[in-house]
Amino acid sequence: MFNGRAREYNTDTISNSGFWPHIEIAEFQKQRAIPLQINDQMIRPVLIAAMQGVNIDLQAVEQHYKEMGIKSAAQISNDYIDGENYAETLYKKAVFARAKAEL
């Protein structure tokens, strides 16, 4: 929506547990078309809660891969598109969908 204000994205990164990828707030804002009216003080906690929820849901998956010697989602597959493998992309998609639904 045009409102005369230039879009400024939050360049912060939310660090994750080590297995799943970190989340860049700007990537969420761009991919999910988050309106300017939703400020950073609302976005960050919602993303953190979404990350925590998805991490809980994927505990068994993470444990399975760790037992196979895989230390991070980046190592799950060697097939990369635009710098990410399918596990990283799907993780971010799940987090972003949850966060946007809560906003």
What are the roles of these predicted feature ranges?
Residues 1-75:
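Conserved short "hinge" loops at termini or chain/domain junctions
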Residues 46-58, 73, 77-103:
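Domain-terminus/edge residues, biased toward the C-terminal soluble/receptor-binding domains
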